[in-house]
Amino acid sequence: MKKQKLICAAAASAMLLASVTAFTGCGSKDNSSAEGASSAAESSSQAAAPPEKTAAVHKQNGNEFDTYQSNTYVATGNNGIVKNAESVTYRAYFPAEQYGELDYRFYFSNAVDSTYNTGAPVHVGMEVSGYTIESARIADGGTSPDDEITNYTDVTFDSEAGREVAAGDDFWSDAVKFDLPQDHYLVWEWTLTGKKIPATNMANLTSATSSVEGGDFEYCDPLPLPQLIGADRGAKYTVAAIGDSITQGCQTDFMAYEYWAAQISQKLGSDYAFWNCGLGWARSSDAAADGNWLERTKNADIVIVAFGTNDIISGEYGGDGGNSAAEIEDYIKQVIAPLKAAGSSVIVFNAPPEDYGDEQESVRTEYNAVLEQLCNDEGVYFFDFASLLCDPETPAAAKY
């Protein structure tokens, strides 16, 4: 099963790589892989673009996102809550997309991005509180969490060591120069005090620990994090992926980074900065709320929209169960519209198989049957993600 899952992720990332590089005109780190995937895409219609859609362009948003681009493929959105923290230090390890000496800045949003599970613990738009940043720093984590952490470097906020964060606040750290050796982890560490602090359900994607008042670091999930690990990389294009746990990479091996979003990030090369905005349990209705989650995603040149699974299973928060195909279509349109208005090129995935019961599978089948035409009507790209994750003879059965 694990081997089959990796094959599926590799196939999806190769096909998507061909789509992204085709309409930007830039090569990838592995051009032979992209060329082979491109030929396959042409023959199988895996990626379809409306004829009137032009090539992606590198946007100028007039804000910090123009300069500071994602430098990790680990997602750090807010789909969790820390109920109470009293001088708790949180630590996480991040693989980098680009190494060497770079200027870093970190972006934060004190808001919940998406609904988790039933929405009882956390839901989109829920009220949060203010909190205090007592200190923050980055460091060289070596090549393993077992290595000694070195080169601790303070991160400041308006030249201060800490910051008072109000409910709903979004803000940037000051710039900090840091030299990260090849294949070393970037460590993020900060000390917080507060209640109802938005956090990331990390789901085994990286080493996530916390320490209370100087005690030993122990496993911690969820944990609060910056929403962007940003660096002045000078990439020609920025790519963001907004979606659910399949995009976030949940239920994959610890710190293996074999899910499709990590694979495509590693293959795209230095012309691209990839920002993983996937969140476990997220629905298209969460993104359609047009909160900070979608707002920050609008800054990317290319946005991948990958929903369907939790829409079918759970539906929007406060609803009465899974959504119908028509309801999902409407939410997807509400996600597409502001992205297009912001000047982003959009790629929409269809819903992958999930070994559903008959009723839920009928919703997936109906939704997938109309999605390509919806994308053509909306002037965005369609990507047949589902066909890469199923056997053609049994399309309803997941092979991952």
Task: Show which residues each predicted segment covers.
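Sec-dependent N-terminal signal peptides
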Residues: 5-16
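C-terminal motif of bacterial Sec signal peptides marking the signal peptidase cleavage site
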Residues: 21-25
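N-terminal secretory targeting modules
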Residues: 28-242, 247-248, 252-253
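Structural motif
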Residues: 187, 304-306, 347
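Conserved SGNH/GDSL esterase-like catalytic core that processes O-acyl groups on lipids
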Residues: 236-241, 246-333, 355-357, 365
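Alpha-helical scaffolding segments of alpha/beta enzyme cores, especially the outer helices
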Residues: 327-341, 366-373
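A short helix->loop->beta-strand "cap" motif at the edges of active sites that frequently abuts
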Residues: 342-346
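Catalytic His-Asp segment of secreted/periplasmic serine-dependent ester chemistry enzymes
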Residues: 353-400
